[in-house]
Amino acid sequence: MASKSGGKPSDRRAGKRKDRNQRMGQRVPELGYYLIVTDTEETEKNYFEGLRDSIPAELKDRLIIKVEKARTVELVEKALELVGKESQYRIPWIVFDRDQVKGFDEIIWTAEKNGVHAGWSNPCFEIWMYAYFGEMPAIRESYTCCDRFADKFEKVTGQKYFKE
């Protein structure tokens, strides 16, 4: 006896039933739209633009980097303002340089409370970029880190590294 679903009842019980993906077609979850707001025009912005440039072309428009002329404590407010204007960017981030930030814990708390992800750089942001060259040296002083990274960058790329 055949059932209304087109197969014998024994077929469904024997594990021959189509799973949900087969019945509905393959559904691939959509990658979210990210908004990264930073207060530095140089290093952090360049890092994220390089990251965006390395992803497939069809995904590049899902990662927006905005540099805001704002104090670090105002970045959460700026991120929320931009999300309000461009609602497709549902995953807001603030990224800032950890050096000399007053109220660090409060900034993180405010971001979390408002649904904004927070990221901050090592006192020498260039330490992150060392990872692209397969290294992660232990350098304590920011100025030493920058100088050593500039040397490494020039050796690998043949170009001078400038930090303003």
Task: For every predicted segment, state its role.
Residues 1-33, 45, 49-66, 84-93, ...:
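C-terminal accessory helical subdomains adjacent to catalytic cores in phosphodiester-
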Residues 35-37:
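Conserved beta-strand elements of the Class I
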Residues 39-40, 95:
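Acidic di-acidic motifs
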Residues 40-44, 68-76:
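Phosphate/oxyanion-binding active-site loops and adjacent basic polyanion-contact surfaces
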Residues 74-88:
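Short, basic/hydrophobic alpha-helical segments
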